[in-house]
Amino acid sequence: MSSAAEQAMPIEFTEQAASKVGKLIAEEENPNLKLRVYVTGGGCSGFQYGFTFDEKKNPGDMEIEKNGVTLLVDPMSLQYLMGGVVSYEEGLQGSRFFVDNPNATTTCGCGSSFSV
């Protein structure tokens, strides 16, 4: 069950993603790290998702906290990610963070690029 604050967030950060971020931060032994999701031009569909760890929040960044870890999204990327879900999956082809984006009109086969 989600709290009212979580329901009001324009991007969802799943339990699986937050748990994996927490494990990765523990491995790095740097509690200041936050997961940043961003959108850049490129990929086979026009835009692509990126994930990186960042120690600082930039002016205008949105912060989404879950289970003691923080997801950061810059204002430009946020406009493309509204209503999206940042998750994490492990499978036969490896593990990855990914975005389920309702704004994407097309996505590439690997799911890392999209168009709007």
From Swiss-Prot:
The keyword Cell membrane does not apply. InterPro entries: FeS_biogenesis, FeS_cluster_insertion, FeS_cluster_insertion_CS, FeS_cluster_insertion_RrpA, HesB-like_dom_sf. It holds the Pfam family Fe-S_biosyn. One of its GO terms (cellular component) is cytosol. Gene3D superfamilies: HesB-like domain (2.60.300.12). Its cofactor is iron-sulfur cluster. SUPFAM superfamilies: HesB-like domain. Binds 1 iron-sulfur cluster per subunit. GO terms for biological process: iron-sulfur cluster assembly. Iron-sulfur cluster binds at residues 44, 108, 110. GO terms for molecular function: 2 iron, 2 sulfur cluster binding; 4 iron, 4 sulfur cluster binding; iron ion binding. Keywords: Iron, Iron-sulfur, Metal-binding. Belongs to the HesB/IscA family. HAMAP family: Fe_S_insert_ErpA (MF_01380). Required for insertion of 4Fe-4S clusters for at least IspG. Homodimer. This is Iron-sulfur cluster insertion protein ErpA.
